[in-house]
Every structure is written in C-alpha cells, then in structure tokens.
Amino acid sequence: MSVDRLYRNLMNKLINANIDLDAYLQLRKAKGYMSVSENDHLRDNLFELCHEMHQHAPRLQHAVAAEEKEALRLAGEAVASAAVCLLSGHHDCPSYIAVDVDKLESCLAVLRLNIHKLNDSQPITHA
C-alpha cells in the first residue's frame, strides 16, 4: 500500500472513530448508561485503531510534515485515552457501564480538533 493510501486509510478510520465516539456519547447522555456489549464493541474498535496507527507510524514518520506528525500523535492519544476510559465502569452493575462522560468528551474534542488539522494540511509528500 502506498504512503498516500495508508495516510488516507488512517484518516478515514480516525473520522469513523470520531463518528462512533460521538454517537456513543449521545446515546450515553440520552439513556444515562450503556450496555456492556455496546461499550466493549467501541472499546475494541478503538484499541484496534491504536494498534494500526502504532504499526504504521514508522512508515508515515518520514512522509508527513512535523505538524501532521504531531496531529496524528495527538489523535492517536485521544483514541487511546477514550479506549482506556471505556475499560472502567463494570463496578456498579455487571450489565451496564457507567463511564466518565467528561473524559470521553475531552477525548472526542481532541480527536476532532486534530482531524480538522490533518484535513487542512497539505497533501503528504512521498518519502
């Protein structure tokens, strides 16, 4: 896979993670809780994206500008923080999850900001 294609693929996955996290938060606010399966599904997807970003980072490292590299790093941190936040919450009731909505909203805001930065940046150059 070319570096351009890899970059676009990761960008699309970050955008999808943003959409999924936003939808999760809206449902969480409306219902007041989330089921274990809903929580685990999102958490697993976020951890999978973290793994993929970490796996492809060396290939992208020399192909992107410093600003893009920093935005990718911060977006990855936001995804990882959201996934870790979703690890907690089984304590109150084994069937439902009570996550820290403020932490998830903070992760979503950082992710959204860095997606915008990446979308506004110039196309990457080939290494």
Predicted regions and their residues:
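Short terminal alpha-helical segments
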Residues: 1-46, 108
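Short, charged, amphipathic alpha-helical segments
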Residues: 8, 36-47, 69-77, 95-106
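Amphipathic, well-ordered alpha-helical segments in soluble domains
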Residues: 13, 17-20, 45, 49-56, ...
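Leucine-rich amphipathic alpha-helices with coiled-coil/heptad-repeat character
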Residues: 21, 28, 60, 64-67, ...
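Charged, low-complexity interaction regions
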Residues: 26-37, 61-66, 87-98
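Short, solvent-exposed, charged loop/turn and helix-capping segments
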Residues: 48-73
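Amphipathic alpha-helical binding modules
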Residues: 76-127
